[in-house]
Regions:
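Hydrophobic helix-and-loop "lid/oligomerization" segment in the mid-to-C-terminal part
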Residues: 1-66
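Secreted, periplasmic, or luminal enzymes acting at the cell surface/secretory milieu
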Residues: 54-177
Length: 177
């Protein structure tokens, strides 16, 4: 790995209870199985390490600022390997926006603020944050997330050139061509 141009490091979760399933909530955002240590050791050998993340939910990434790229692939299915290879070789533009917020720490998430919200009270979970769930909580509380809802690469590049308006003076409701 030290002499390689880059290292592709595949990390993530699995569909096991307590990791990434509908059976049980995660008690931690940390990647299991010492994956953070694997990133640290790999970066020590080759700092040009690209992380390919396979997970269905946000995870902690204490190394996020140390890697040149993170490719969030979620669970891409049977042809995921082909799709990831096409992205990495430049055959396809890696584009998309995050559908969730990645908190910096578990404590930043309102769902983990009390025993009423996690793990719940006698099989009942109380959403004390009311409408301020997900990205709304981070915005309202002015908490900077690791990656915000909507973070990601553009779907395309575009530019406007040689624009001209049909008039120099317009008011609200006017049609311009």
């Amino acid at each position: 790995p030290a002499t390689a141009d880059a290292v592709l490091l595949f990390l993530g979760l699995s569909h096991r209870p307590g990791l990434d399933s509908e059976v049980k909530d995660k008690a931690s955002l940390a990647l299991p199985w010492q994956q953070d240590e694997l990133v640290r050791r790999t970066l020590a050998v080759n700092p040009n390490t690209i992380v390919v993340l396979l997970a269905g939910s946000p995870v902690a990434m204490p190394w996020a600022d140390d890697v040149p790229a993170i490719l969030a692939c979620w669970y891409p299915g049977m042809e995921g390997g082909t799709a990831i290879a096409r992205l990495l070789f430049g055959d396809t533009n890696p584009s998309g926006k995050l559908p969730v917020t990645f908190p910096k720490t578990l404590a930043d998430s309102p769902a983990h603020c009390s025993s009423r919200t996690f793990p719940g009270d006698r099989r009942s979970v109380h959403y004390d944050e009311e409408l301020f769930v997900g990205y709304r909580h981070f915005y309202r509380q002015e908490i900077e997330p690791l990656f915000a809802f909507g973070h990601g690469l553009s779907y395309t590049d575009f530019a406007y050139t040689n624009l001209h308006l049909s008039t120099n003076c317009a008011t609200a409701g006017d049609t311009l061509v």
